[in-house]
Amino acid sequence: IHYSNPHIIVGCVPVFEGKVLLCKRAIEPRKGFWTLPAGFMENGETTLQGATRETWEEAKARVTNVDLYRIFDVPYISQVYMFYRCDLDDGEHSAGPESLETQLYAEADIPWDNIAFQVVSETLKEYFSDAAAGHFPVRVSAIDHRAKRS
């Protein structure tokens, strides 16, 4: 028997002084576009461990106060995304091998037209809305269609 199971992508929404840390992708897909630090979960780790590992690998960033924030089911590509909201420990970050650069962004400065993936755009919009409201519910939803890309 052979099973083909979905892939789990884990990542963080690292925040420092009201700004969110983004990474400019150095690899395909969507090379040169901005994303949250995230990647495929590895065998033998929890989703939390995977999210913090990916944040270190892609942005050389240490995080604390890590809480589950967003889950997306993306059945048309057999993926599940899990993002954790967290604090960027000391504000320090730098590009890892899968990132061209890293940068902290206030909401008004985010390069919205250059965000790599729909799940990242939606997560960022929800984060800033939730931050303004002072309440961070865990959200679960599905994206069951391909977004149009320019």
How would you label these PLM feature ranges?
Residues 41-126, 130, 135-136, 149:
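Unchanged
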Residues 12-14, 72:
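Short acidic-hydrophobic surface loop/beta-edge motif
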Residues 11, 19, 101:
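Conserved beta-strand and immediately adjacent loop positions that scaffold enzyme active sites
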Residues 15-57:
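Conserved Nudix-box catalytic region and its N-terminal flanking loop in Nudix hydrolases
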Residues 140-150:
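Amphipathic alpha-helical surface "interface" segments used
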Residues 7, 25, 115:
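Surface loops and adjacent helix of pleckstrin homology
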Residues 8-10, 30-32, 64, 80-82:
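A generic structural signal for short beta-strands and their flanking turns/coil linkers
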Residues 1-12:
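Acidic, metal-coordinating catalytic segment for phosphate/diphosphate chemistry
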